[in-house]
Amino acid sequence: MNFDKNISISDLAWVLVPYYGEKAEEKTFSDIKRHDRFTVSSKISQRNFLMIEKIFQDYLNDVEFIELSPLQPLGINCVLAGTNGKKNIPTIRGQEINSDATTALFLEAYRSLNSSEEIRLATNVRTIRPKIFDEKSKFLTHFKVFAEITIGRQASPFGEKEVFMIARHLMDEIAVLKLIRTKTKNNIVGFNVYISNLFFLKSMLLTITERKSQNDVIEAKRIWEESGLPAQLILNSNTVDELKTLGFNKGIRVLEMFLRALFSHVDFHNDANVNWFFDLSRSAGINYYRHIAYKITAVSNDNLELPLADGGSNDWGAKISNDKQFFTVSSGVGTELLIQNFLRLA
């Protein structure tokens, strides 16, 4: 179908809404009995989701939990997160279906920000993406995820408040996952936490004169593979010195501030079921997060390791306000992935 690309969304909707309305009225019972990958229901009981959500809400009792609209402004993820527009699902009326709960939470938080205090919002919501998964994985195009956002203003020293909130998101999510391991029947034997500073790979990307891929994630992965650098280091008080020995100097200050905040948590030092690493190989999220990012994986008793949580610092607040004093920290935990692969519930 050819149409004028300069046509407005409202004019396009004026054409498409009646067209789809007519098509809907032509459908039969046989047509609507058919399922596709977008309309098949989750196999997980809603009771199990509610049980897990209660653990999150009880622990995070100082965070406001909200119920997001399933529709968000068209382009929200392209504008804020740099997502390829083809990975979103638009509606014919000019919105897009919620595919990233953290960007939606960010807009809600930003609208409410009117003081120097941080705003923390969270939700457990079903999101949908058009990605095609291998049938063996049993992953659906729609899935539930816990998401959390914190926005606020920087204070002196610049960046310290921001990295403190990254550490808080991380330690809160570790604490909740440990509670879930304690309070439910599951096959989880432990957790691995991978800390990264994506500024390192971003800096290496800038030195490349001839790229083999225009995709920054792919190119950054190639750079790391050809660098001879280790994939991970054990995270401890010697990590910064080890990184300096490997030649990393730019971006060290923000990492030092983050590690001070992280190491100050008592729980960091006293849980044998949580292993900590610094991940030099991570390229995922290189244009999503500013610098510090983390990933939490769960390990089962048959050595299955799957990523459950991901978080870090974004530039969304600074970008939308044109004010570098704004910071944004976002994170998410795959609650559907957790229940499907690790929990043994009724």
Give residue spans per PLM region.
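General structural signal for secondary-structure boundaries
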Residues: M1-S8, I180, S196-F200
